[in-house]
A protein has these predicted regions:
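Short hydrophobic beta-strand element within catalytic cores of glycosyltransferases
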Residues: 277-281
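A charged, aromatic-enriched C-terminal amphipathic alpha-helix characteristic of glycosyltransferases
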Residues: 319-353
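Aromatic "clamp/platform" in nucleotide-sugar-dependent glycosyltransferases that forms part
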Residues: 261
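Conserved acidic donor-binding segment of nucleotide-sugar-dependent glycosyltransferases
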Residues: 293, 297-304, 313-319
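Nucleotide-activated donor-binding/catalytic signature segment of Leloir-type glycosyltransferases, i.e.
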Residues: 223-241
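Conserved donor-binding/catalytic core segment of Leloir-type glycosyltransferases
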Residues: 172-202, 212
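Donor nucleotide-sugar binding/catalytic pocket of nucleotide-sugar-dependent glycosyltransferases
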Residues: 103, 129-168, 176
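Glycosyltransferase donor-sugar binding loop
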Residues: 38-40, 184, 209-223
Length: 358
């Protein structure tokens, strides 16, 4: 679906890969996008001025600048991403007086930030309450947002995988020896990556598995130091690469593995399912909307033995679970193709504009 002339003002972190993908696809489908950001990312954007020493004040003090931009560019839609940050900023700027506001939830803005303090909770709630529509990638996430504030309307739209990358889906489901496991989550406390190494170190040291992690994350140095001491060269680290190259790289693995302590519906897991990997993840609510023990493996958070037993089963039984993997890919094709997900977003934008005009 194309939307010629639809003018969208996106407020988001310009450093984020999710922002890059989102803005690029809106433009590909015919939207004119004006991206404003407090961060200084590589993509083309308008840089909002950061004022004050405290990051939380940056949003407050940028409100006047955003008001000026709204009057100048006259967008059809204002689309903040991350309710507790840019959603709050859009609310302070009175964006709703200029155009309908669609706020995209990113997960931690709802599941983590509000618990930091009363201030964080209230600013998140304010951002939500001043939105015409709130969009999240799981029912769990949207419900959590509704528990924080009265929301005018909401939708669930996943972050899917691009159509072209579905062609990288594995043709051969045979499990490799050693079993190749990829953990494509950055090294942050919430992703609990070192737990995975501790749990699976005996299997790695016996040469039964190979574990691959990204280079990215603020705890990367700490992770490497401790992980190397446990499994040596069975630990593989990959650097950031172009998306198409990474999709091909991920498709070469047998298993997708996550130990996230908090999450909505993980985009990386959906991508892995579309590519034909077997998913294994810690049993948390957002994950359950895509993963159960009928199409992959869930294990109790922090339970090393439970995770180790799942991986041992895969190695010993040598059961590639072909039916699961085909069914997972079909669901992704049906519900989580990125181009279709963005087309749905654009339709919602048109609906809001029409509703305001009527």
């Amino acid at each position: 679906m194309s939307a010629p002339g639809l003018h969208v003002m996106v407020l988001a972190d310009s450093r984020s890969f999710h922002t890059e993908r989102y803005v690029a696809e809106l433009r590909r489908q015919g939207c004119r996008v004006f991206l404003a950001s407090l961060e200084r990312g590589r993509m083309l954007h308008y840089t909002l001025r950061s004022r004050g020493f405290l990051r939380q004040l940056h949003y407050v003090l940028a409100a006047n600048e955003v008001r000026t931009l709204l009057r100048r560019i006259k967008p059809d839609i204002v689309n903040p991403h991350f309710a507790s940050g840019y959603g709050f900023l859009a609310a302070l700027a009175g964006a709703r007086r200029h155009a309908p506001v669609i706020t995209n939830l990113w997960g931690s803005d709802i599941l983590l930030v509000p618990d930091k303090s009363i201030f964080h909770r209230r600013k998140t709630a304010y951002g939500l309450s001043q939105s015409d529509l709130v969009v999240g990638d799981s029912h769990y996430l949207v419900k959590a947002a509704r528990d924080l504030a009265v929301i005018a309307d909401s939708r669930v739209i996943p972050w899917g995988i691009e159509t072209a990358f579905l062609d990288y889906h594995r043709r051969d489901y045979a499990l490799q020896k050693p079993l190749r496991i990829i953990v494509p989550r950055p090294h942050e406390k919430i992703y609990n990556n070192l737990f995975l190494v501790r749990a699976l170190a005996p299997l790695a040291n016996d040469g039964l598995i190979e574990m691959t992690f990204p280079e990215a994350g603020s705890l990367s140095g700490h992770f490497r130091l401790h992980a190397r001491s446990m499994i040596g060269d069975r630990l593989k680290i990959y650097q950031r690469m172009p998306r198409a190259e990474f999709m091909q790289f991920m498709a070469e693995h047998d298993v997708y593995l996550s130990s996230a302590l908090s999450d909505s519906s993980p985009a990386s897991m959906i991508e892995a399912m579309g590519l034909g990997l077997l998913p294994i993840a810690a049993d948390i609510p957002g994950v359950r909307e895509w993963l159960s023990n009928d199409n992959g493996y869930l294990y109790e958070t922090y339970n090393e033995k439970a995770l180790r037993n799942i991986v041992k089963y895969l190695i010993e039984e040598d059961d590639p679970k072909e039916a699961w993997r085909r069914a997972n890919a079909e669901r992704v094709r049906s519900e989580a193709v990125f181009e279709n997900n963005i087309a749905e977003m654009i339709k919602l934008m048109h609906d809001l504009i029409a509703r305001r005009k009527s």
